[in-house]
Design a protein with these regions (language model features):
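Conserved PLP-dependent catalytic core of the aminotransferase class-I/II
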Residues: 152, 314-315, 319-366
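Conserved C-terminal alpha-helix-loop-beta "cap" of PLP-dependent enzymes
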Residues: 347-421
Length: 429
């Protein structure tokens, strides 16, 4: 005998009813429907709406969202590296003059505005913006050394995050690698020998941004190779534009000493420098090529330049950051605002959250820059591993654990977010 149909009182709610019951969650309706369907399949007679809400909350946490970085890593790659200031999203839409010449009304170049400002900031004749530093290196080598040799010291055949390897970039560019010197010692005469014996069109100097070779070592400076007769490309990576840091009232911080910069590399004789926009430069993800105008022109005319060109949002953000440099307004660049906060200032903030948990900490630059560097900082220390608890907050708070103690470093937390940390700690007490 067939089962009797469920009465209206016993029937489970429809998928649409479940989705509408959890519509207070900030998700598009189709995703709420997905959560409802999955909940029905899992419910087994339980509270299907509560199950749908749990699933929807998990879905919500897979989307891109704001987080609070309390790790003390200033340029945290997993959290987008350098934070940038976003203009109000509530303003009405507008177009931009990205490729419009307002004087003639004709089509212009998207590179003219931001690139000219960047060139001015780092003392270059010209500059070109692409979508990341790997693209910058690839484009330069493809445009200037295709089917020819590029001399690189064996100590600088680096791999950074994401599997970016200099030898593989050279292979993709159409150039071929000419290894020079040894892992720990490379001299000028090694480059002379390589140039004499091979069809070398470029010397590529690569900054050891995420590791150090110490002990019995020797490197060849850019200034020692300027008379070798071929262009020198300096991939400084980290994006410091001027070692003197004229945008900082007290000059460069001690932890920055020794970091190569765009301006000083060019002054030393580099023909081109390449670096990231979202590291020490403090802007959006981008690759910047700066140097001699004739070489930049060759890069801009190469077909790859179209492939790796950035969009209007990137160019606009870069323009804003570069103007802040030119006007020497470090407070307008979030990275430098964080990096120059004093320990005393951080301790005052920590005391307002909880005097019980105040502790000294050590922040780090991160982002594959300045390996081994620690920056004196302050924050909060709680006994036990609470990283998952903090990560489940709204907004999520990302912190670190060491020896079963949870650390929240305030150097990387915007002061306006202290209240969220305060509220989360109160839940633990």
């Amino acid at each position: 005998m067939s089962e009797q149909p469920l009465s209206p009182l016993n029937r489970p709610p429809s998928i649409d009813q479940i989705a509408r019951a959890i519509s207070d969650l900030d998700l598009p309706h189709p995703l709420l429907v997905d959560a409802a369907r999955e909940a029905v399949n899992k419910a087994n007679g339980g509270d299907v709406i509560s199950e749908a809400r749990k699933i929807a909350e998990i879905i919500s946490r897979t989307l891109l969202t704001d987080v609070i970085n309390a790790t003390g890593v200033l340029l945290h790659t997993n959290m987008g590296r350098s934070p940038i200031k976003i203009e109000s999203q509530n303003q009405h839409f507008r177009f931009s003059n990205l490729e419009l010449d307002l004087e003639t009304g004709e089509r212009g170049s998207r590179q003219d505005r931001s690139s000219n400002l960047i060139a001015r900031a780092c003392g270059a004749e010209s500059a070109l913006v692409v979508n990341n530093c790997a693209s910058a290196v690839l484009l330069v080598i493809a445009a200037l050394a295709e089917e020819r040799g590029v001399a690189v010291s064996r100590s600088e055949l680096v791999e950074i995050g994401g599997g970016f390897r200099i030898p593989e970039i050279l292979e993709q560019s159409g150039a071929h690698l000419v290894e020079v010197g040894t892992t720990n010692r490379t001299r000028r005469k090694d480059f002379e020998k390589a140039i004499t014996k091979n069809d070398v069109s470029l010397i590529l100097k690569v900054h050891q941004s995420n590791y150090r070779i110490v002990g019995f070592t020797e490197t060849t400076e850019i200034s020692d190779m300027t008379d070798l007769g071929i262009p020198i490309i300096a991939d400084i990576g980290s994006g410091l534009i001027d070692s003197a840091c004229p945008w900082l009232e007290n000059g460069p911080p001690k932890w920055l000493i020794g970091e190569p910069s765009a301006k000083q590399s060019l002054e030393s004789g580099a023909d081109i420098v390449t670096f990231s926009g979202d590291k020490l430069f403090g802007g959006p993800q981008a690759g910047i090529i700066a140097g001699k105008a004739e070489l930049i022109e060759l890069c801009s005319k190469h077909p790859l330049s179209r492939v790796v060109r950035p969009g209007s949002l990137t160019m606009s953000a870069l323009q804003n950051v570069t103007i802040s440099y030119l006007e020497r307004r470090a407070s307008s660049i979030p990275f430098w605002e964080m990096a120059t906060t004093t320990v005393d200032e951080l301790k005052i903030r920590a005391s307002k959250i909880s005097k019980e948990f105040i502790t000294d900490t050590s922040a780090t630059p991160g982002g594959g820059t300045l390996p081994g560097v620690e920056i004196p900082s302050a924050g909060l220390k709680l006994t036990g591993d609470h990283v998952e608890f903090f990560r489940q907050q709204n907004p999520p708070i990302i912190c670190r654990v060491d020896n079963n103690q949870t650390f929240l470093d305030l150097m990387t937390v915007h002061p306006s977010d202290d209240v969220f940390i305060d509220n989360a700690i109160k839940k633990i007490r």
